[in-house]
Amino acid sequence: MTTVFQTMPTFLAGLNIANFGAATSQFPKLESEITAPRQSMSTAFQKMPTFTSVISVPSIAAIAPQMPSVKPEKGVIGQCLICGEPSTGKHYGIVACLGCKTFFRRAVVQRQDTECKREKPCDVTTMARKACRACRYRKCLESGMSKEALQPRRDLIGCRRIRSRPSCSTSTPTPPRPQVEDKSQYLTLLENLTTIDDRLRKKKLEVVASRQAAVDLAVLAKQGCMSITDTSGPSTSRYVPGGTSPNGGDHKMMVMLGTDISVSTQSELLMMLEWTRTLPVFASLPVQDRSVILKRFAVHCLILEHGYYTAQANIDDVWLITNGTCMPRNVEKLEEGCKISVSADRRWRQEKLYKQMTDCCIDEVATPLRNLKLSPQEIVVIKIIVLFNCGCSSDYSEITEASRRIVLTFRNKVVSALFAYYESVGLQNYAERFGNLVLMLSGVSSAASSMLEAYQVMRLFKITPFDPLSQELLFNI
């Protein structure tokens, strides 16, 4: 302790503090008192000089002039003439607060309703100004706010900087818009695809009609009726030529049997294979990728072809296949001649096994297609979209990345060709129509799942004798 107080004068000398002599003269006396007994310790501290006597602290008055002056806040210039809240300026011609200024601008720009629902004028004060927008807007006008003071071109979300465009002499040429040659190429591509699809569809219907005629001849041969006039009747009773609605009175709707499903499925899938070979990019894909795409597209192809055929036939509450037979939504609502030909076993299967598939196909596919009235160009584009969407998703590792890029590029090209076709025929709101086509694809997928499940039941219980090609494409067997 003695050493500490001995060194303190030296420390204070470096500080150059006033009254240093008076402070240091008392340190020897303090040293003797500190060495006294502990009972005199309190006396020693009482005799120590105070801090203010050792160090002189400048007064606050001396410091105050050196502090920077703070400007007072800008005062209000008056109360808002509308609600009475303090205001700091004039807005749209009168003294108004920021709240009433913003309200008036939004009411004018957005053309909000200005009709009061009460009989008496509402109170427009600071606490109740939001109760009635009509009365508040009316008071704004009565107080002197002017609509002409608004800047109508001001953006609601703030000012936008308009970048100055360089002069034509120094600017680089902008990318040209698609030329007429590109549009003509798109139209030519779509025309070729549509022609091939129509030709194969007609060929398929002719094959189905020939097969059905052969079956009818075989039935008549068993019955001993070989006249040509008699053979024409049964053929027209099951086949609807060209997919149009039958107008003849001799037409009789028939419920499809297992053999009808088998023959129709085989014909559809054979035409599908022939159709895909005509696509420009499909032949360039690896065999494994083509196999995956075809297996996933097979049931969707049946849905699209049968749905397009049903929509053209214009018959309600039935699902038709290409040989003219149908799956009815309700067997009891069929004509008497058709209802009598349905066996009890077939009626039970229709109500218990095929009911869900029939309803889904009619509601999700046939009815939307009939309402949209698809053109031949649209149906071929829809088929290509579904074909290249089956198997080319990133979820399926079987498809190589190179094949996925190829098919997606071609799919986008076909969609652009459809847009060019819409423009060429002068269709209004074709973007909306294409959106409706795309929205329909979810129903196609749902109906495809229901059909595949029903066909699995038919195969499992040997109701329908599917050929090896159909089993490989549909069931991957």
Curated annotation (Swiss-Prot):
Gene3D superfamilies: Erythroid Transcription Factor GATA-1, subunit A, Retinoid X Receptor
DNA bind region: 77-152
Domain of life: Eukaryota
Cell compartments where the protein resides: Nucleus
UniProt keywords, alphabetically: DNA-binding, Metal-binding, Nucleus, Receptor, Transcription, Transcription regulation, Zinc, Zinc-finger
Domain NR LBD: start-end pairs: 216-477
Disulfide bridge map: none
An example Gene Ontology CC term for this record: nucleus
GO MF term list: DNA-binding transcription factor activity; RNA polymerase II cis-regulatory region sequence-specific DNA binding; zinc ion binding
Residue spans, zinc finger NR C4-type: 80-100, 116-140
Physiological role: Orphan nuclear receptor.
Protein name (Swiss-Prot/TrEMBL): Nuclear hormone receptor family member nhr-19
Organism of derivation: Caenorhabditis elegans
Gene: nhr-19
